[in-house]
C-alpha cells in the first residue's frame, strides 16, 4: 500500500513549460546561438540546467561557462514565472487534502533550492510539504534515483511505499530506479511516452486524482 507521495515541481506542481521554453529562448538570443536540436526543449525537460546547457548547445563548454549560463537561465526562468505563476489544475486541492489526511508529502526536483522555495511560496504550496529535495541536495540528476531515494529517506518511508508524480521521461525513470510507483503528468510528454518510460499510468492534471484511490496500484 502506498504511504507517501512525492511530486516533481516543474510541470507537476507548477505549470512551467512555457516559462522554461521562454527562458531558454531568451538565453540563446542573449548569447547569439541557435539550438543544436530540432526540438531543443525536449532535451532539457527534467534535467538540471547544468546538464541541459551542453545538450542544448551540443558543444564542449568549460565548467565556468556551464555554471554561468545555467545561472542566467535560472534567473530568466524565475523572472518569467513570477510574472505569470500558474499551478497545474487540481494540484493545490490535492496537496492540501493530503496534508489534511497527514499523508507524508515531498518534492523531488531538478530545480535549485532558490527557485523551488520562491516558486512554491508564490503558489501558496510551500508550507504543505514535509520534505523538499532539490538539485542542491544531490550529486546526480535524474534519471539517477538519488533525488527520490533521499526524499524517501527524509520522509522515513520505504521507497516501495512511495508514489511519484512526474512529467519528464528522465523523472519517471528515476522514480522507477528508486523502486517507487510513478504516475505521469502529460504537461510535457504524451501518455504513451510516459508509460513507455515506466509510468504505470498518466493524468492530464489533478482534477480527478483522489486519495486514497490513487494509493492503490
Predicted features and spans:
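Asp-based, Mg2+/Mn2+-dependent phosphohydrolase catalytic module
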Residues: 1-3, 96-99, 103, 112-217
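N-terminal helical cap/lid subdomain that shapes the substrate entry/recognition surface
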Residues: 2-92, 96-101
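Short, flexible loop segments at the rims of nucleotide/cofactor-binding pockets, characterized by
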Residues: 81-86, 110, 179-180
